[in-house]
């Protein structure tokens, strides 16, 4: 029993030794996990400054290319400019372009100049490289103002151009009209052509005098509303001729001069049509402007539409008359429908008889 008791302490010691080895082996993974977590935490803390550190390294390598002798000095100057020595400047470096970095640059002494080489030269290179983006960003608004003009300025510039074009068109008339001799003439009225009269008989093909011709119809309300204004034109322009004709009675002339709708106003020089009035607002003032722009002849002042112009010679009220062409068209259409109906009924009666004869 004594030897067994004497052997127990070495066995216990061996068990304790193996237990310590086992604990040490099992503790390695746990310690590795702790080291990994600690390294990951440190890496995450240092991650925000990573782009700036890479940029600083890049700038340091660029300086080494320019100045191989001053590697350590350039690195120190770069760290001093970037503010990597103090922990309070990390937020400044995170906003390099706007804000605090500009304040930091402005707070530095302005007496530092960029010399040709040395420590000051490397510092200037680092600063210029770091804040080149800031300088470029400051020039973007200037470029935008240079290439893009404001709408108000563009409109104000276009207005004088339009005015100049109008003045040029007014100074140089498109149609050179020979003014007629009005000596001894007191009554200036509009002449209306009847069905037997031809327009070419009133136009001089060998002359350069101008005539304003109106194509109208008495049943058109637009022609009736234009009539008083057109009746007053001979008094405003006594040097010109004014004619009016019923387009329904002179269909050949309407087709010849492209009258597809009434009222239609054409300006003739001799026997040649030169201009057409295309404005929807048909008043005395717009007609004056049209004639002046085309011929350069100014209208007489104080000429307005009077009560006599409402009466004639061109009627200003709708004339109700029978349109025989419309009556004939309706009669032909009704006759054709009746004839087609009768023929259809007779065909229906004939078809059963033909079938019966065919069976027999």
Swiss-Prot record:
It holds the Pfam family Thioredoxin. Residues 153-296 form the Thioredoxin domain. The keyword Aminoacyl-tRNA synthetase does not apply. It comes from the Eukaryota. InterPro entries: Thioredoxin-like_sf, Thioredoxin_domain, TXNDC15. Residues 33-321 are extracellular. It is a single-pass type I membrane protein. Keywords: Cell membrane, Cell projection, Ciliopathy, Cilium biogenesis/degradation, Disease variant, Glycoprotein, Meckel syndrome, Membrane, Signal, Transmembrane, Transmembrane helix. Residues 343-360 are cytoplasmic. Residues 141-173 are annotated as: Disordered. Residues 143-155 have a biased composition (Acidic residues). Gene3D superfamilies: Glutaredoxin. Glycans are attached at residues 187, 194, 206, 293. It is found in: Cell projection, Cilium membrane. One of its GO terms (biological process) is positive regulation of smoothened signaling pathway. PROSITE patterns: THIOREDOXIN_2. One of its GO terms (cellular component) is ciliary membrane. CDD domains: PDI_a_ERp44_like. It is linked to Meckel syndrome 14: A form of Meckel syndrome, an autosomal recessive disorder characterized by a combination of renal cysts and variably associated features including developmental anomalies of the central nervous system (typically encephalocele), hepatic ductal dysplasia and cysts, and polydactyly. Death occurs in the prenatal or perinatal period. Acts as a positive regulator of ciliary hedgehog signaling. Involved in ciliogenesis. This is Thioredoxin domain-containing protein 15. It comes from Homo sapiens. The lineage of its organism: Eukaryota, Metazoa, Chordata, Craniata, Vertebrata.
């Amino acid at each position: 029993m004594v030897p067994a008791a004497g052997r127990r302490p070495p066995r216990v010691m061996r068990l304790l030794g193996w237990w310590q080895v086992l604990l040490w082996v099992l503790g390695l993974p746990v310690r590795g996990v702790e080291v990994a977590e600690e390294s990951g935490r440190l890496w995450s803390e240092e991650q925000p400054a990573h782009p700036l550190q890479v940029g600083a390294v890049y700038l340091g390598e660029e300086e080494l290319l320019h100045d191989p002798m001053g590697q350590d000095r350039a690195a120190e100057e770069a760290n001093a400019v970037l503010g990597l020595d103090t922990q309070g400047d990390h937020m400044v470096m995170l906003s390099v372009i706007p804000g605090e970095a500009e304040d930091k640059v402005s707070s530095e002494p302005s007496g530092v100049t960029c010399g040709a080489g040395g420590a000051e030269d490397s510092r200037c290179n680092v600063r210029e490289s770091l804040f080149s983006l800031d300088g470029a960003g400051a020039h973007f608004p200037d470029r935008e103002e240079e290439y893009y003009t404001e709408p108000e300025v563009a409109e104000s510039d276009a207005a004088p151009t339009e005015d100049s074009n109008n003045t040029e068109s007014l100074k140089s008339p498109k149609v050179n009209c020979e003014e007629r001799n009005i000596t001894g003439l007191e009554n200036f009225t509009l002449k209306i052509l009847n069905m037997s009269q031809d327009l070419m008989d009133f136009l001089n093909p060998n002359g350069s005098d101008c005539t304003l011709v109106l194509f109208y119809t008495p049943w058109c309300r637009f022609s009736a509303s234009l009539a008083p204004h057109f009746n007053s034109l001979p008094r405003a322009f006594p040097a010109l001729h004014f004619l009016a004709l019923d387009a329904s009675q002179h269909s050949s002339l309407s087709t010849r001069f492209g009258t597809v709708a009434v009222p239609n106003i054409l300006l003739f020089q001799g026997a040649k049509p030169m201009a057409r009035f295309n404005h929807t607002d048909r008043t005395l003032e717009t007609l004056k402007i049209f004639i002046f722009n085309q011929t350069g002849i100014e209208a007489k002042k104080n000429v307005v539409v009077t009560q006599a112009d409402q009466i004639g010679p061109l009627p200003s009220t709708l004339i109700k008359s029978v349109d025989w062409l419309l009556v004939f068209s309706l009669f032909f259409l009704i006759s054709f429908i009746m004839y087609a109906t009768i023929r259809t009924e007779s065909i229906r009666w004939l078809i059963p008889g033909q079938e019966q004869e065919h069976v027999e």
